[in-house]
Amino acid sequence: MTLQQQIIKALGAKPQINAEEEIRRSVDFLKSYLQTYPFIKSLVLGISGGQDSTLAGKLCQMAINELRQETGNESLQFIAVRLPYGVQADEQDCQDAIAFIQPDRVLTVNIKGAVLASEQALREACIELSDFVRGNEKARERMKAQYSIAGMTSGVVVGTDHAAEAITGFFTKYGDGGTDINPLYRLNKRQGKQLLAALGCPEHLYKKAPTADLEDDRPSLPDEVALGVTYDNIDDYLEGKNVPQQVARTIENWYLKTEHKRRPPITVFDDFWKK
């Protein structure tokens, strides 16, 4: 088995999907989890205005709506969390995503004060954060807020990780990568677009250039620039297609060096890191 085949198998990626079937699969997955653990009353998700959180948010609200109708349990809710750092550059996109999702509840937590306070505390301990590490601080502060909200609403935190993100480890460890349940896991980027199109999402929310937008020195840096490959390249690779050798090397290098991000903390029983 080639490394490409191993990666595809590990991430559960498929070369083709039926959008309606995958929507149903994710919604049923969320419903089944909530029914298995009836003490869970809320799904909590940060909404950025990008493709992934818009899709995950819509699926969450659909699952909650169906469960309330089927069970009569009105205590169930989906909480969409706005988590700007100061003023968000694509604020209108975020508002458009909220309008599309129609969440039960919307909370806004501006993380700038908390990030600056943490940075100052570290500075007083003689640790000066680089712009890149400050970006990770933002991602972790966002997740911290979501877990506090989940803790106070008997909830779980929903993630947006999918195959095209997991393959490169393009997330912050214990930031946006630290979640409870990931309904998009298995899909690549273009497949996520297919689901949003089937759901009637405004096109500009999934046709915009994806960006983590964590770095102050490089605001709205496109993911594809940071990664050195395009999502079309990544999606082709995940679909088992032949890609240029340099593209394959770049993708596989990202996969191998970020393996620790896709695993629990390493123990004496693990040996993957010895490869």
From Swiss-Prot:
GO terms for biological process: NAD biosynthetic process. The keyword NAD applies. Its EC number is 6.3.1.5. One of its GO terms (cellular component) is cytoplasm. InterPro entries: NAD/GMP_synthase, NAD_synthase, NH(3)-dep_NAD(+)_synth, Rossmann-like_a/b/a_fold. Gene3D superfamilies: HUPs. Pathway: Cofactor biosynthesis; NAD(+) biosynthesis; NAD(+) from deamido-NAD(+) (ammonia route): step 1/1. Mg(2+) binds at D52, E165. ATP binds at G46, I47, S48, G49, G50, Q51, D52, S53, T160, K189, T211. GO terms for molecular function: ATP binding; glutaminase activity; metal ion binding; NAD+ synthase (glutamine-hydrolyzing) activity; NAD+ synthase activity. It catalyses: deamido-NAD(+) + NH4(+) + ATP = AMP + diphosphate + NAD(+) + H(+). It comes from the Bacteria. It is an enzyme of class 6 (ligase). The keyword NADP does not apply. Deamido-NAD(+) binds at R140, K173, D180, H260, K261. Keywords: ATP-binding, Ligase, Magnesium, Metal-binding, NAD, Nucleotide-binding. It holds the Pfam family NAD_synthase. Catalyzes the ATP-dependent amidation of deamido-NAD to form NAD. Uses ammonia as a nitrogen source. HAMAP family: NadE_ammonia_dep. PANTHER family: NH 3 /GLUTAMINE-DEPENDENT NAD + SYNTHETASE, NH(3)-DEPENDENT NAD(+) SYNTHETASE. Belongs to the NAD synthetase family. Homodimer. This is NH(3)-dependent NAD(+) synthetase.
